[in-house]
Structure formats: C-alpha cells, structure tokens
Amino acid sequence: MQPTNSEKFTEKVWEAIYRTQEMYKQAQQQQIETEHLMKALLEQDGLAISIFNKLAVPVDRVRDRTDDFIRRQPKVSGSGTSVYWGRRADALLXRAEEYRKQFEDSFISIEHLLLGYAQDSRFGKALLSEFRYPDEAKLRNAIEQVRGNQKVTDQTPENKYESLEKYGRDLTQYAREGKLDPVIGRDDEIRRTIQILSRRTKNNPVLIGEPGVGKTAIAEGLAQRILSGDVPQSLKDRKLIALDMGALIAGAKYRGEFEERLKAVLKEVTDSRGNIILFIDEIHTVVGAGATQGAMDAGNLLKPMLARGELRCIGATTLDEYRKYIEKDAALERRFQQVFVDQPSVEDTISILRGLKERYEVHHGVKISDSALVAAATLSTRYISDRFLPSKAIDLVDEAAAKLKMEITSKPEELDEVDRKVLQLEMERLSLQKENDAGSRDRLERLERELADFKEDQSKLNAQWQAEKSVITDLQKLKEEIDRVNLEIQQAERDYDLNRAAELKYGKLNELNRKVEETESQLSQIQKSGATLLREEVLESDIAEIISKWTGIPVSKLVESEMQKLLQLDDVLHQRVIGQDEAVTAVSDAIQRSRAGLSDPNRPTASFIFLGPTGVGKTELAKALAAFLFDTEEAMVRIDMSEYMEKHSVSRLIGAPPGYVGYEEGGQLTEAVRRRPYSVILFDEIEKAHPDVFNVMLQILDDGRVTDSQGRTVDFKNTIIIMTSNIGSQYIFEYGGDDDRYEEILSRVMEAMLSNFRPEFLNRIDEIIIFHSLQKAQLREIVKIQTHRLESRLARKMSLKLSDAALDFLAEGFDPVYGARPLKRAIQRELETTIAKEILRSNFTEGDTIFVDVGETERLEFKRLPSEVLTTQ
C-alpha cells in the first residue's frame, strides 16, 4: 500500500510519512523502511510516546535503538530523485489499514501503525523483544487506556485522547505527591461543598469570594480530604481534576476544534460514572469561551450535563466577575449552588500562617519567628487595605523569607567592604612599584603591611562566611529530607504498609531529627560568639520593612536615630517656618503621636485647618512637613481648591461616574493616595471650593476612608490632612500679636468659619490653628532663609554672604498686608537680577564668594571676596 493519498491518514501519521522521505535520503539509504517511520513517530510529541509511557517502555532507549538500526543498514551513493517504499514498510501500512477497520475508525492513526509493528519480522519484533514488549493484547489495552472510548472520526483525533491529562491537573495526585500546601480552617466551607456535591441533581458548588481569600485552597483542601478518606462514602476514592481553560482554548485553530476538545473532556468525565469531579477556577471564563460567529460557547455545552447531575463541577470566581458574567446567564446560574468564602479574621490568618510556616521554612532555608507571622497578619490588615487576607499576609512572609535567603547567599557587607579595600590597595601598590624615589618606597612598605593586615581579615571573614553558609545550607537540606520522609510515611500509611511506615518513622526520621538538632546547636554556638555574619531567622522587623517597601509607610519600629530625629521635629520646622510657634507645635505633636503608635488607627493621622492672612507660612509649613517625612517637598499631594468651584468638579476628586469621560482614570485625590498611602495632603484655600466638596471630606475626616467611582475603598488612615484658608484674616491682622485680645479674635474667627462651613465639617477637624501676621522682628530670619535658598541655586559653586545692613535693606520689602511674599519679589529684584548680570559679564566665576552690603547710595553693592579675607573672618 503506497501512501499517495493524505485523506486516508490522520495529520500526525501523514506528517511522519512526509518526514521519512527526508530521513532515508539523509541516511543515504535505498528506500523507506519501517525503522524510518518509527523514528519519525518518536520525533513527534504525540500518541506514540504516550503509549510507550503507558507500557513503561523508556522512549529514549527506543529512539537510540532505532537510530542504531538505521546506521547499520547499507548505504548507497548518488542523488536519486524518486521516493521508494520498501516491501516491509508497505506491508506495515497494509496491516494498519486492517486494524483501522477492526477499530471501526475513519482514518489510519498512530495506534494502528504501532499494532502493525508487533508483526514486523525485520525491525519491529527485534526492537520490541529487546524491551520485553508485551503481547498484542497488552498493547491493545494500553491503546484503549489512552484512547478511552473515542473513535478516529477526523484527522486530529489526538486532541480527544487523554483530554483530562492534557487540559487538566489532577489535584488528588498533587496531594499524594505533597505538592499542595496544607489547608488550615475553612471546615465550614469544605463541608458545605461536600454537601452540595452529594446532591442528586445540580450538585455543583461555586465558591464566591474576594480575590485572595482562599477559594482555590478550598478545592485543594477537598483533594487532601479525599486522599485521607475524610469524606462521605459518595466521594471516597474520587479524583478532583482542575480544568485549565487556557490550555483548552490555546491552539484551537479551526472552527469547532475548541468544542471538540471540551466535548472530549466532558465525555471522559461522564464516562467515569461520577469518579471524576471537575474543578474550574475562574469559572466566569467559560461564559463566552470559544464562541465565534454561530458557535456555542463553553457555558452552553456545560449546561445540560450540569442540570442532569451527569457532571459534578466545582467553580470558583470573584464576586464582581460572578455578577458580571454568571448572573447575566440565568440558566447557568441556577445550575450552580453558591458557597460564599469570607475573608478570614486576623486570628484565623495567624493560624493559617502557622500551618504554612514549615513549608516556607523548607523552601527558603530560613527560620520564621512566630512574631513575624503575627506581624504579617496584623500589619497587613492595618496598612494594606486594597487586598485581602490571608493572601496578603502569606505574600509578606514569603517575600521577607526570600529577601533573607538572598542576603544569606550574597556576600556579607563587612566582607564586601574588606574586598573593595584590598582591591584599592593592590591598585595603589601596582602604581607605587613603578616609582623609585625614597618617599614612594616608604609608602609602598607601609602599604604592603596594611594590605597584609586586610588580606588576613579577608581570609578570616571569608572562612567564617563559608562556614556559616555551609551550616545553614546543611540545615535546609536536612529539613527538605525530613519533608520527603514525612511524605513517604503518609504514603506508606495510606497503603497500609505499616512495616515501612514504622521503619521510616522510628528509624530514618529520628536520625534526621537528631542531625537537625546537632546542626542547629552548631549554628547557635556560632551566633552566640557574637561574630556572626549571617542571620537566618525572619523577624517582625523584616515584615515591617517589606510593608514599607510596598506602601511607602514607615512601619518599622523606631530606631534610636529616628527617635532623635522625631524629637527634633519641632526645631526642624521652626527653622523653616518663622513666627508660628503654636502651629509648628501642634503639627509636630501629631506626628510624634502617630509614629509612637498612639494615634487613632481608624482616622487620619491628623487633620488641621490653617487660618491666617496671605504670606504668613501656611503652605510653607505643609511643605516643610512633607520634606521632613519624605526628604522631598514633591511628596506632598497638593489640591488647589480654586479648581473645584463648580458642583460637578467633585467628581474630579473621587473619579467620574460610570458612563462619563474619564471613568477609567479614577480621581485626582483617590489615585494619589492609593499610590502613596503615607502622605501629606494639602487642600489649599478651601473656602473657594463648592460646598458639595465638603460632603466627600466628611467621611475622610471621620472614618479615614472614601469609596472612589470604581467602588474601591481608599484608605486615608496614614495621611496628614492640612487645609488652608484666608477666612477671618482681617481679624487676625487687627490682632497684631496683642495677647490680651487673642480670645476675642479667636471667637470672631470661629464665627466667620461657622458662617462659611457647616458644623459637622468643623467638628471633625482635629485642630484649627491661627497663623499670626508677621512682625518686623521676624523678617531678618525669613530673609536669611530665602538667601540660603538662592545660594543653593547658585550651581557654579559660589558662596553668598550678606551684611546685617543688606539683610535689613531687603527686609524693607515687607508689607504686613501681604506677608512675606513681597520679600521674595524684593530678593528677586534687588539680589537675583544683579547677580545674574554679573555672572554673565564674568565678574563672578566658579569658587567666588559674593559679599553683599549697602553702599553710600542706599543701594546694594556686590563685591567678590578674596580667599584670604575669608580665612581671617
């Protein structure tokens, strides 16, 4: 039978036949024979390999023997153009045709060819007898295991064979191999799932909950219970297989191919007569999956089986996606019974983390302290509001352990510093060896001695690092071995091989535990010596550090240097904001309370209204605070309330409502705080905003949160809210620093506030702070601050010095009505302009010191000071 018509063969067989035409030419042989066809079949990642695997025949060795057989055949020279099929290859195809008829298939497939090899006296029998190949009955049995009850009705039958192996993951097998993490708690949800699965019809639970609460973990917990036999009789010895919708859709090129694959999966499940339970994670993906014009989607293919109880299916999806996809399809929704999976409490999360602790310790090769687990649960609840427990707490522990593992395997900082110093000294030595003068030789001798000392330190530190790393690595290997032995013990107990279980439990496991104790004592001795380079335990501070990296919130415990810094906050703010003692003290007290952990965790860190005339330092104090907390003024979120004068502009703060332009972009305020939850928010000139804006402010000030247009809760609990206003500034201006009239002025200002803002808004503010109008005595300090800023802008390494007379001259720019802002204009006009012109004329150059004084003409004079004058001053 010459293969001339591709329509008789499946695609894979025709590909193999086509490939043999190249093979026999490459091998320089006379004709195509059965060995060439076998090699072509083994090159495919297809059915031949699956059948050999079922028979426990090593595929690599079959491939090697086939290559050897081809090499031993006689070669011919010359380049013939015709393709010749050998007599035995022709006979093989004829036998395959007979098997096709026996199987009642429409096309010759790979399994028909393999059956034909059992009767090939030249190559097939010689090859298969070497591997003690079973008789034809066993070969047929292996083929039936792979094919199931499928018939070859099209040219791509392989898509339907072993569909569940291709498109699914056996969770019960994963549990048997110890690849699933232990599931702690969730007993009610697992029991409810089992209850629904035990129904006669519509026995399909769907797990609904927020992302990260543990929906998939419930399915894994059920797989572990099935394995341990802790389920009702109706679920004993069942298989739980997770369907991979991505794999099912991927590569389905032709119309109807996806439906064929899914039908093959469903046929395998129904043919198992209830032995297989299907788990579809992200079940909303079946709605519309694979649907093209006029084709059915996966959801519609599932519906009949789900309703009749032929298919037991567990689904999992989030609340939003369930509402968006499943609820719209009422026929699909009624076939599923809902199981709500709530977020676990902090206490339950700590229990879950304790259950997972050993797995993460073995994986990362580090120890995890219990305080770190408690910190992960409590700190993630407080500071990471847009994610859910236990996922966010587990991620924290995982990342902290990974960070510590990275530090263990990387070179320690002390050793790295010594290595760099040795490299630097060696480079200096090479340079000095080229010099011949006496001074260089003396320096070389001293350098040699210094280098010898550093090299000695280097070798000691290196030896210590390697010793510590070796002990920690040994400990990890021992723990991995204990994990593997525990898995073997569980397997032996399930198989009732009690002798093996006892041998492992009381022999090998005890020996490994003893070695672990010895290694741990060895490590603790190294650590007690105080000279340790590596740390191998994840602590609470590591968790706090990861949270700080995720959110930008300084969660870590206060170290000595930061305590000192916070105590000096009052002084730091006073250096920038002159003459506003009450305001500075109130703000610094709020920050100190927050960082010491005493502020109310359910409200913003602090909220202030700064009242006062223009130019007295209201905005400057907010900038100074942002610079202190974040080292940059740019970290302040500034909202100019003059932009929110219209009623509709409220939507710009929290995002446009659905259907409006900009809905996807979110709000200016909410997005800024979501990206940076620890920030100073300045609402500048709040009296200019529309009254409706303050409705949004109420919940921010009271509960420390607001819901944006997308339905996300944005957390303001770690923000400092500062609002500035000019209301009542005329009364403050009248006050003029007279302490006797302060109470009277305060009551008049509050009356003005009540006439502009509602009481419920003012009642939520922590403190309303009045900024006094500036006095002439404070102006010289402000001028100094402004000239220091000018000096920092002189990017040409120039210095600026002003005489007392020059400072007083610039202070004349003060106007009590406009505050300190006219000073800026005076400095710009009198100082900056002249210096700029002198630089352009090259009168001042890099390294100069510019001295400014008042001349006889009552104008500022600029001089360049020589360096000797500077040294005598």
UniProtKB/Swiss-Prot annotation:
Q: What is its main location?
A: cytoplasm
What SMART domains does this protein map onto? AAA, ClpB_D2-small
Residue span of region Repeat 2:
85-149
Q: Name one GO biological process term.
A: cellular response to heat
One annotated GO molecular function is:
ATP hydrolysis activity
Identify the keywords attached in UniProt to this record, alphabetized: ATP-binding, Chaperone, Coiled coil, Cytoplasm, Nucleotide-binding, Repeat, Stress response
For this protein, the record's InterPro entries field holds: AAA+_ATPase (IPR003593), ATPase_AAA_core (IPR003959), Chaperonin_ClpB (IPR017730), Clp_ATPase_C (IPR019489), Clp_N_dom_sf (IPR036628), Clp_R_dom (IPR004176), ClpA/B (IPR001270), ClpA/B_CS1 (IPR018368)
Query: Where are the stretches annotated C-terminal?
Result: 774-873
Q: Which amino acids does the record list as binding ATP 2? A: 612-619
Instruction: Name the coiled-coil region(s).
Output: 394-528
Please tell me whether the keyword Lipoprotein is annotated for this protein.
Answer: no
Domain Clp R, chain residue ranges per copy: 6-149
Q: Does the keyword Coiled coil feature in the UniProt annotation?
A: yes
Region (NBD1) residue ranges read: 162-343
Explain what induces or represses this protein's expression: By stress conditions, such as excess light and low temperatures.
Kindly list the positions annotated as binding ATP 1: 209-216
Give the residue ranges for region: Repeat 1: 9-73
GO CC annotation terms, alphabetical: cytoplasm
List locations, semicolon-separated: Cytoplasm
- Domains as described in the record: The Clp repeat (R) domain probably functions as a substrate-discriminating domain, recruiting aggregated proteins to the ClpB hexamer and/or stabilizing bound proteins. The NBD2 domain is responsible for oligomerization, whereas the NBD1 domain stabilizes the hexamer probably in an ATP-dependent manner. The movement of the coiled-coil domain is essential for ClpB ability to rescue proteins from an aggregated state, probably by pulling apart large aggregated proteins, which are bound between the coiled-coils motifs of adjacent ClpB subunits in the functional hexamer.
- What is stated as this protein's family in its record? Belongs to the ClpA/ClpB family.
Q: What does this protein do?
A: Part of a stress-induced multi-chaperone system, it is involved in the recovery of the cell from heat-induced damage, in cooperation with DnaK, DnaJ and GrpE. Acts before DnaK, in the processing of protein aggregates. Protein binding stimulates the ATPase activity; ATP hydrolysis unfolds the denatured protein aggregates, which probably helps expose new hydrophobic binding sites on the surface of ClpB-bound aggregates, contributing to the solubilization and refolding of denatured protein aggregates by DnaK.
What name appears for this protein in its UniProt entry?
Chaperone protein ClpB
**UniProt source species:** Leptolyngbya boryana (Plectonema boryanum)
**By which gene is this protein encoded?**
clpB
